[in-house]
UniProtKB/Swiss-Prot annotation:
One of its GO terms (biological process) is response to antibiotic. This is Multidrug efflux pump subunit AcrA. Gene3D superfamilies: 2.40.30.170, 2.40.420.20, 2.40.50.100, Helix hairpin bin. A lipid is attached at residue 25 (N-palmitoyl cysteine). Residues 377-397 are annotated as: Disordered. Residues 98-172 form a coiled coil. Residues 313-397 are annotated as: Required for growth on efflux drugs. Disruption phenotype: Cannot grow on efflux substrates novobiocin or fusidic acid. GO terms for cellular component: efflux pump complex; outer membrane-bounded periplasmic space; periplasmic side of plasma membrane; plasma membrane. Residues 1-24 form the signal peptide. A lipid is attached at residue 25 (S-diacylglycerol cysteine).
Length: 397
């Protein structure tokens, strides 16, 4: 006898009724759940004054550079400086053998004395003939000749004086001096070397390091944008000069601030960039020519800047920046923007947003354009939490 008993008709009816009731409840709950609006975190856009800075690569260069070359030929007798030391303008660096130049100077002085004596005699003759002019003892022709001889003698004195001065200058050039104050590098010649006037090789190089120049490059497009923003009043500079700060290659901020001096007049055709030159105090000679640095250029003050947290900005496959904005009807819409520059953890937005717009910065993955949402304002205290909790996805177009 089979001990398994079948289901009675009544039991089957009860089971079907219960199943239908449960299905109806699930559908109702699903419908109620679908009607709930997703919650998103938003920030309300506002304008604020912002100092706009740009970080550009650059290299240092000496304020002045003097290549020391001999102006007379001769043998180097002595070097009078320590390589790598700081020197003052006018100090003696090398001594060239002065013997021949001293002799030339002495000879020139002797020729001058002879010329002066001849000029004195010629003048005495003119004076004597002048008294006798008109008498039978001297003719007009003789007087004119004496006068011409005196003038020639005076000209010879002038030439002799010039020869003395030239000899004196050449003698002084045997003492090679520094034309500027600064730090002198290595010597390219030693004692006993023969040097020549106007030679191609410098004896040494002196560089003035305080102040010091920093040459940075900026794209011509950014340069034109900066000029346009300054012209139309979007950016404002104090005293018409932009301040510049430096970050050295080891990541340390240079203690002295500088100012932008000028921009080059031509654009590099290869790179499309333009050179800007800033000047910095360098009293301790911390900066040396040729060092790589990063210059932070204060472009100016934007009195009505709009900053948006970076987690609220997404990029299309083409690289265009967009944000999700909650409208007055609490519906989400996509808004294209121009994010020109990163400022900390925010984007500087120059186009596409205005004060009062509500930008979604958390819960982006839960919404799409046209969906009605429950917007919750994100404050500064929980903005970091929102940033870590919601990573923006790339918009697709």
């Amino acid at each position: 006898m089979n001990k398994n008993r079948g289901f009675t008709p009544l039991a089957v009816v009860l089971m079907l009724s219960g199943s239908l009731a449960l299905t109806g409840c699930d559908d109702k709950q699903a419908q109620q759940g679908g009607q709930q609006m997703p919650a998103v975190g938003v920030v309300t856009v506002k304008t604020e004054p912002l100092q706009i800075t740009t970080e550009l690569p650059g290299r240092t260069s000496a304020y002045r550079i003097a290549e020391v070359r001999p102006q007379v030929s001769g043998i180097i007798l002595k070097r009078n400086f320590k390589e790598g030391s700081d020197i003052e303008a006018g100090v003696s660096l090398y001594q060239i053998d002065p013997a021949t130049y001293q002799a030339t100077y002495d000879s020139a002085k002797g020729d001058l004395a002879k010329a002066q004596a001849a000029a004195n005699i010629a003048q005495l003759t003119v004076n004597r003939y002048q008294k006798l002019l008109g008498t039978q003892y001297i003719s007009k022709q003789e007087y004119d000749q004496a006068l011409a001889d005196a003038q020639q003698a005076n000209a010879a004195v002038t030439a002799a004086k010039a020869a003395v001065e030239t000899a004196r200058i050449n003698l002084a050039y045997t003492k090679v001096t520094s034309p500027i104050s600064g730090r002198i590098g290595k010597s390219n010649v030693t004692e006993g070397a023969l040097v020549q006037n106007g030679q191609a090789t410098a004896l040494a190089t002196v560089q003035q390091l305080d102040p010091i120049y920093v040459d940075v490059t900026q794209s011509s497009n950014d340069f034109l944008r900066l000029k346009q923003e300054l012209a139309n009043g979007t950016l404002k500079q104090e005293n018409g000069k932009a301040k510049v700060s430096l970050i050295t290659s080891d990541g340390i901020k240079f203690p002295q601030d500088g100012t932008l001096e000028f921009s080059d007049v031509t654009v590099d055709q290869t790179t499309g960039s333009i050179t800007l030159r800033a000047i910095f105090p360098n009293p301790d000679h911390t900066l040396l020519p040729g060092m790589f640095v990063r210059a932070r250029l204060e472009e100016g003050l934007n009195p009505n800047a709009i900053l948006v947290p970076q987690q609220g900005v997404t990029r299309t496959p083409r690289g265009d920046a967009t944000v999700l904005v909650v409208g007055a009807d609490d519906k989400v819409e996509t808004r294209p923007i121009v994010a020109s520059q990163a400022i900390g953890d925010k984007w500087l937005v120059t186009e596409g947003l205005k004060a009062g717009d509500r930008v979604v910065i958390s819960g982006l993955q839960k919404v799409r354009p046209g969906v009605q949402v429950k917007a919750q304002e994100v404050t500064a205290d929980n903005n970091q939490q929102a940033a870590s909790g919601a990573q923006p996805e790339q918009s697709k177009s």
